[in-house]
Every structure is written in C-alpha cells, then in structure tokens.
C-alpha cells in the first residue's frame, strides 16, 4: 500500500466497533503512528504460564479518555489461549486469574460484607447476546437466605442478589430504569454487570474477558446505544464483566484483506509486484480472497465458537 492509502486504512481501522479498551488503545496507536504509550493512558501486562495474558489499561485523564473513547477508570483484559479446548486444570487456572482480578477491583470499592447486586444483561433467546442471563442462573444467591435462614450460612457471607432485566424490545423498559428501582429498594453497595461484548478480533471471540470499574453503556459496541449503567446514573459503583461474542462484518473483510496483502508482499521481492497490477487484476485478487468459500469458512468458525458458550 502507498503511504497515503496506508494512512487512510489505519484511520478506517480505528472506526471499527469494539467494546474492549485494550483494542481501542491499540487501534488509536496504530492510526496515529504512536510507538510509546498514549498520553493519559497507563498499561501493564502480566503473563500467567504460556496461555494467559492479563493487560491492565488505566485511563488517567480527560486526554486519555478522549483518545480511546473510554471513561477514566480501570480496564482489565484477560486473554486466554486455547480456552475453547482447555482441559479442567487449564479452566481452573483461568478461573483463578479472573477471580483474582475481579476481587481486587471489588475491594477497591466496597468492604467484604457489603451487599452486591449482580445483573445479567442481554437476550436469553439470541445466542451471541445470551451470556448475561445464562451466567445469572449459575450464581449463588444469598440475600434471601441471610434474611430468612441466616443460621445456615457463615457469619462472613456476603449478601448477593441477582436479576436479568431482559431487553428493551421485550420489556418496553430501559435497563437503567429497572435497576434504579431495584437499587432504591434493596440498597446494594455495588453492582456487577455481566454482558456480551463486541471485539475487533475474531481470535478474541469467547477467549477474552474484560473487567472494568467504569460501568457500561449497553449496545454501544454494536451501534445500539442504550442508557448508561454507571455510578453517576445508578448511585453506586458499577463493575462490568464482559466476553466478546460478536465481531463486525467489516472486521472480517478487513482482516482478510490484510492477510492477503501481507501474503502477496511476502511472496514478492518488493511492492513493485502490487504496483504493476492493473486495477482489474487487483479487484480479481481481492474477490478471490473474499470468495464464498472463504466467507463460509469464517462464518462456520464463528458459529462453532458461539455454540461453545
């Protein structure tokens, strides 16, 4: 690619939708040719074994906030290789890493006995959006037991309640409005929200976890923005946990083009090979990359991944 075309391509890449702060940070650096860290952003990496990488992104100032379009706060991304084929021991290790990071964030905001409300966002009947409601069914709820049968629990048991508020299309009520009513009645000191996210990378589908203490704007990653669920709107700290389950179609196309260009450049001695092609030849080569067989294969892989949720 020419320098001008490359710059345009980088700017377009930055516009791709993603809920992950780490990806927004990486895209911004690429689009603006930044080799060091972005002003107002702090990043720290920690590797656990060969398969788990934890990246902590801190947005420290308004400048950092504007750069990656994420509020000031802490964003932790846990990338787990081979999660979809992990054995029991590997799953346990991944669980311990997630637990450690989540506990550290919770401890920053509340004490060990403060009541917590867990919220599972999403539509149970739409596979890529069903993460939140499905997780809610697996959580140990204690609020009612502490109220009516406290003798069956340890003294240090935290009060945990949970709700899956559905989606606006089926309830006619904004999630923020539902949660405001719940908060006013049961007075949790912290809200933990679980939701499906969008990613810039196919490789992160069902293989990465983001934990953030800035709350969440439901639907923002796929252009269907709803009212924000944050400390400002709900009155209590909000921690959001999400796993990417969708990627934008343009992402798949862009990745295919990138792989195609890289492959051609590897096989050619220089970029002269590309420059010598007529526009019609370039079009035919690109069309070959995006042939129905290639697209069908990509769709199949994504479908298999989502089915593992």
Where are these regions (language model features)?
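Short glycine-rich or small-residue beta-strand-to-loop segments that form or flank ligand, phosphate
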Residues: 77-81, 115-126, 162-166
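A structural signal for small-residue-enriched, beta-sheet-centric alpha/beta enzyme cores
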Residues: 163-164, 193-301, 307
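N-terminal amphipathic/basic leader segments beginning at the initiator methionine
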Residues: 10-69
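Conserved small/polar residues in nucleotide/adenosyl-binding loops
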Residues: 4-12, 298-305
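A structural-propensity feature for long, helix-poor, extended segments
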Residues: 155-182
């Amino acid at each position: 690619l020419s320098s001008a075309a490359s710059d345009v391509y980088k700017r377009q890449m930055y516009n791709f939708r993603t809920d992950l702060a780490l990806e927004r940070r990486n895209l911004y650096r690429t689009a603006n040719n930044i080799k060091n860290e972005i002003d107002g952003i702090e990043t720290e990496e920690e590797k656990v074994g060969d398969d788990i990488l934890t990246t902590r992104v801190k947005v420290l100032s308004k400048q950092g906030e504007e750069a990656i379009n994420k509020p000031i706060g802490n964003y932790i991304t846990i990338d787990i290789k081979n999660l979809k084929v992990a054995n029991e021991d590997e799953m346990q290790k991944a669980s311990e890493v997630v637990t450690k990071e989540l506990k550290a964030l919770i401890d920053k905001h509340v004490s060990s006995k403060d009541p917590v409300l867990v919220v599972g966002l999403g539509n149970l009947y739409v596979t890529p959006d069903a993460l939140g409601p499905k997780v809610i069914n697996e959580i140990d709820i204690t609020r009612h037991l502490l109220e009516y049968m406290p003798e069956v629990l340890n003294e240090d048991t935290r009060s945990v309640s949970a709700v899956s508020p559905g989606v606006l299309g089926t309830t006619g009520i904004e999630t923020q409005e539902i949660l405001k009513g719940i908060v006013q009645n049961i007075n949790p000191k912290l809200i933990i929200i679980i939701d499906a996210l969008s990613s810039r990378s196919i490789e992160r589908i069902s293989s990465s976890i983001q934990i953030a203490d800035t709350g969440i704007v439901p639907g923002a990653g796929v252009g269907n923005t709803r009212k924000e669920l944050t400390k400002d709107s709900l009155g209590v700290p909000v921690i959001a946990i999400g796993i990417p389950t969708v990627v934008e179609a343009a992402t798949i196309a862009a990745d295919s083009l990138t792989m195609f260009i890289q492959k051609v450049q590897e096989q050619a001695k220089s970029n002269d090979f590309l420059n010598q092609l007529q526009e019609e030849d370039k079009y035919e080569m690109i069309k070959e990359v995006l042939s129905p067989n290639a697209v069908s294969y990509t769709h199949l892989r994504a479908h298999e991944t989502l089915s593992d949720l």
